[in-house]
Every structure is written in structure tokens, then in C-alpha cells.
């Protein structure tokens, strides 16, 4: 395995872990909690999931050949949810973004890593663009876990090693 292919494998593994962590948190909340906000300026879990999905679809559709900020993306609209989407609608949207990401990752070769891509007109190597996306998504996954844990309170089931537990 080359260092480049090891990197691509690790990127996929890290994104898979982030997706699983967020889904573990989202699965614990009620349908009402999925739409709840802490205050008028905060985002609900559904809004965060919608934004992440929209970001993935924009960044990774035609990744190597078009700017990552697609003209048909309505970023501001990702933060405005009209009505009360169902859990199924939220998760269908969520999954569609991840499918675009993973399909693109599956097509990248070692030689693609030093190619240039653009995000909002800013030049990045593919490595930089992937790292930028991992950072962005880790931030939002942290928000999802924090908000879900807050909403579930005493009913929260940890997604990692519980406190006061010895490691084997």
C-alpha cells in the first residue's frame, strides 16, 4: 500500500466513523427533539444534518471538475426548515449527502491527491480539500452529539467508553 492509498483509506474510515457517531446520537432522540433548538439562534439536529448533507452534495458532486460550491446549492436554505420534516425525510436527505461523498472517495486514485480543486474559487489540493471537509464535519458531528446528549439528559446512552470504566 502506498502512502497515498493509505491516506485515502484512512479518510474513508474517518468519515465512516463520523457518520456512525452522528447516527448513534440521532437515533437516541425523539422525533420532537430532532427539531428542537436551545434558543432562537441555535440549529436543531435536523438543520445540522440538512446542512451537512447539502455541504457534502455540493463539495463532492463532480469533485475534480467543478467548484465545490455549486451554483444550485441554497446554503442559507439549509438552515431554514419549513414545517416539520419527518425523521425519515431528515435521514433520507442525510444519507444522500454521504452517498455522494463515498461514491467520490471510491473513484479517487493516488494520483488525484495533488490535483487542484476549487471551493468558492479558492484553490486547494485534493488532500487539502479532504482535510477541510473532515474538519468541517467533525465540528458538526460534535454539535450533533452534544445537542443530542443534552436533549436526552439522563436517558443518554454513551457512544464511547462510559465514565469511570477501566480500560481492558
Name each model feature, range by range.
Residues 8, 12-16, 20-26, 31-78, ...:
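Short, contiguous alpha-helical
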Residues 79-117, 127-137:
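Acidic/histidine-rich alpha-helical segments that form the ligand environment
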Residues 1-12, 80-82, 89:
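Short, charged, low-complexity loops and linkers
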Amino acid at each position: 500500500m502506498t502512502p497515498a492509498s493509505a491516506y485515502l483509506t484512512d479518510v474513508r474510515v474517518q468519515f465512516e466513523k463520523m457518520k456512525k457517531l452522528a447516527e448513534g446520537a440521532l437515533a437516541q432522540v425523539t422525533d420532537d427533539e430532532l427539531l428542537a433548538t436551545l434558543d432562537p439562534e441555535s440549529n436543531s439536529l435536523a438543520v445540522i444534518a440538512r446542512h451537512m448533507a447539502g455541504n457534502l452534495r455540493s463539495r463532492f458532486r463532480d469533485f475534480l471538475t467543478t467548484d465545490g460550491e455549486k451554483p444550485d446549492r441554497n446554503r442559507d436554505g439549509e438552515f431554514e426548515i419549513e414545517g416539520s420534516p419527518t425523521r425519515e425525510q431528515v435521514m433520507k436527505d442525510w444519507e444522500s449527502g454521504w452517498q455522494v461523498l463515498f461514491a467520490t472517495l471510491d473513484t479517487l486514485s493516488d494520483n488525484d491527491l495533488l490535483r487542484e480543486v476549487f471551493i468558492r474559487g479558492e484553490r486547494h489540493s485534493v488532500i487539502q480539500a479532504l482535510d477541510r471537509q473532515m474538519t468541517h464535519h467533525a465540528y458538526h458531528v460534535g454539535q450533533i452529539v452534544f445537542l443530542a446528549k443534552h436533549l436526552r439528559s439522563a436517558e443518554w446512552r454513551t457512544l464511547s467508553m462510559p465514565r469511570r470504566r477501566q480500560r481492558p
